[in-house]
Structures are given as structure tokens and as C-alpha cells.
């Protein structure tokens, strides 16, 4: 007998069926609505304590910011593939649902929708729905890029990442739409764990599409990626584990990005300075230092004599 009871065991076919079921879920309206709610909450949080006054004074700018962030992945992927950037707005049902969510988050009576959405159990459920939608977007982005650029793995990975984590890049444009801009704080310069996870998921889907190193059934791979996103999202919300890849990055950067070499160079320089400060001076260096002291004394005496002459005059 193992540690896990036999009743808890799940066979391979059941997991594949579960992955196929999750993959065929319709995102509209529930999963999309969860995405819009969390996006509007992110915009409102980014606005800070002036969010209410800003939404009253500049409603169009507030709406445009939320729409840019809600469809950021589609905007960015269209830009990368040379497709019309405005094409994500062709579905009026998506725009209508996003606008309704935006209105409720910013203008609901007594701010009841915002308070309900930020309540931890509700936010937890919305986050799970959004991670399922994120996986669907990454898989769809890789599939679309494979159809257009079948020989370019880099393009396929980039489009998948853009679909899953495009809001971090488009955030610069969104900030311009509401009159603020922070050029030193964007996703390319400081990628979040979500972007890193999207890169990993996009690589997995790309390799699986080409049957390279990932030979498991597509439905099983899809289910594993969904579980990967949900697990780390719950860990971030419940346990405040925000970036599990940071220790690995620090080690890799120290080994392959010059960290060890730079530390060794600093140690050598410090050793040289210590040796130079503690070594015995030669006779010439001692004589030169004595001459410098004598010259300094002569200059001081000359200055003092000049001062006394001026006083006597």
C-alpha cells in the first residue's frame, strides 16, 4: 500500500477527459467577466486614492484605460503579427460586457460592487476563472502564430506571451491615456511572475505543437498548465508567494551573466588595495614624503610672515 488511498487515484484517461472539458469551456460571459472585473480593479488600484474623483472628472479616459487593459493581449498580438490593431474591438458583445463591468466597478451605488469584488473569497474565485482564461489565450495565441509562421518558434512564443500577459506592456499606453507615465516601471524592464509564467507556458505549448520534448496528449498538457497557473495564483493570494522563480534567476545570473566574474574582480581589487596600504615604503618614497612635508611647512611660514607684514603696514 502506498501513502495515497486507492480511492484517490486518477487514471490517465480521466485526466485527459478533464483537460478536454476545461479546454472546451466557453469563456463568454463568466470567464471574460471575471477578467474584466480584475482588470478594472487593477486600473482603480493604480489610480490610487484619487480613483473616485478621476472617474467622475474624466469618465472617458477611465473607460478607455479599462478597455485598453482588458484587451491588451489581443492588441499586442495583433501588433506583433501585423494585423489590424483595432480588430479585438469587432465583437460588440465583448465591448458591452466590459463597459458594464467598468461602470459597476467605478459607479455602483455605495461602491458595493467594488467592495464585493475586493472581498477575499470573491477575489479568489475571480482569480481562478481568470487563470483558466489566461491559459486559453496563450494556447490560442500559439495556435494562431503556428498557422501564420509555422517555422518560427520565437514568434509563436512571443504571441503566446503577448496574449497571456500583454497588459503589462500595454500599461504604458494606458497610463498615457489617463495623463500619467512611468517609463522606468514597465513589464519589459521588470517582468512580473505572471509574465515569466506565461513565457514558460508559451514555450510548453510551442514544443507540444511541434512534438519536441513534450509528447503528452494536448488535453493533458493543457490541464497541467491550467493547474500550474491556478496553483501559483492561489499561493500568491493566500501565502504571499509572489515570485518563486527569483532564487533560480539569481543563481543563473550569478553563474552565466557575469555575477561571479564581477565578484571575483571586486575581491582582487580589494586585495590589491589592502596590500598597497600595508606594504613597506621604499627610501625614495620616504624621502619624497619628507620633502612634501618640508615644502608644506615653508608655505605655511611664508603665509604667516605675509600676514604679519600686512598687519604692521
From Swiss-Prot:
Q: Which InterPro entries match?
A: TRIC_channel
Give GO cellular component annotations, separated by semicolons. Answer: endoplasmic reticulum membrane
Keyword annotations from UniProtKB, A to Z: Endoplasmic reticulum, Ion channel, Ion transport, Membrane, Potassium, Potassium channel, Potassium transport, Transmembrane, Transmembrane helix, Transport
Provide the primary localization: endoplasmic reticulum
Q: Which residues lie on this side of the membrane: Cytoplasmic?
A: 49-57, 109-118, 179-192, 240-313
| Summary of the function given for this chain in its UniProt record | Potassium channel that mediates transmembrane potassium transport. Might be required for maintenance of rapid intracellular calcium release. May act as a potassium counter-ion channel that functions in synchronization with calcium release from intracellular stores. Binds phosphatidylinositol 4,5-bisphosphate (PIP2).
Q: How does this polypeptide assemble, per the annotation?
A: Homotrimer; trimerization probably requires binding to phosphatidylinositol 4,5-bisphosphate (PIP2).
Name assigned to this protein? Trimeric intracellular cation channel type 1B.2
Q: Which organism is it from?
A: Caenorhabditis elegans
Source species taxonomy: Eukaryota, Metazoa, Ecdysozoa, Nematoda, Chromadorea
Amino acid at each position: 500500500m502506498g501513502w495515497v488511498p486507492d480511492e484517490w487515484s486518477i487514471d490517465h484517461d480521466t485526466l485527459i477527459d478533464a483537460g478536454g472539458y476545461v479546454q472546451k469551456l466557453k469563456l463568454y460571459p463568466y470567464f471574460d467577466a471575471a477578467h474584466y472585473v480584475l482588470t478594472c480593479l487593477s486600473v482603480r488600484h493604480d489610480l490610487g486614492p484619487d480613483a473616485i474623483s478621476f472617474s467622475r472628472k474624466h469618465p472617458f479616459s477611465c473607460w478607455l484605460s479599462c478597455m485598453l487593459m482588458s484587451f491588451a493581449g489581443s492588441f499586442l498580438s495583433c501588433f506583433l503579427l501585423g494585423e489590424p490593431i483595432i480588430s479585438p474591438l469587432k465583437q460588440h458583445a465583448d465591448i458591452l460586457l466590459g463597459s458594464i463591468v467598468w461602470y459597476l466597478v467605478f459607479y455602483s451605488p455605495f461602491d458595493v460592487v467594488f467592495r464585493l469584488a475586493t472581498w477575499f473569497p470573491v477575489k479568489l474565485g475571480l482569480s481562478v476563472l481568470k487563470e483558466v482564461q489566461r491559459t486559453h489565450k496563450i494556447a490560442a495565441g500559439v495556435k494562431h502564430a503556428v498557422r501564420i509562421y509555422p517555422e518560427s518558434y520565437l514568434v509563436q512564443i512571443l504571441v503566446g506571451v503577448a496574449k497571456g500577459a500583454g497588459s503589462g506592456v500595454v500599461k504604458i499606453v494606458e497610463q498615457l491615456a489617463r495623463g500619467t507615465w512611468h517609463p522606468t516601471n514597465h513589464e519589459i524592464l521588470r517582468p512580473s511572475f505572471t509574465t515569466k509564467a506565461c513565457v514558460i507556458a508559451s514555450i510548453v505549448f510551442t514544443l507540444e505543437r511541434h512534438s519536441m520534448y513534450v509528447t503528452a496528449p494536448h488535453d493533458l498538457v493543457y490541464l497541467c498548465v491550467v493547474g500550474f497557473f491556478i496553483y501559483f495564483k492561489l499561493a500568491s493570494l493566500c501565502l504571499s508567494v509572489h515570485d518563486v522563480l527569483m532564487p533560480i534567476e539569481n543563481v543563473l545570473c550569478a553563474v552565466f551573466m557575469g555575477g561571479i566574474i564581477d565578484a571575483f574582480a571586486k575581491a582582487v581589487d580589494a586585495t590589491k588595495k589592502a596590500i598597497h596600504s600595508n606594504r613597506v615604503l621604499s627610501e625614495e618614497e620616504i624621502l619624497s614624503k619628507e620633502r612634501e612635508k618640508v615644502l608644506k611647512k615653508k608655505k605655511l611660514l611664508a603665509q604667516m610672515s605675509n600676514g604679519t607684514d600686512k598687519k604692521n603696514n
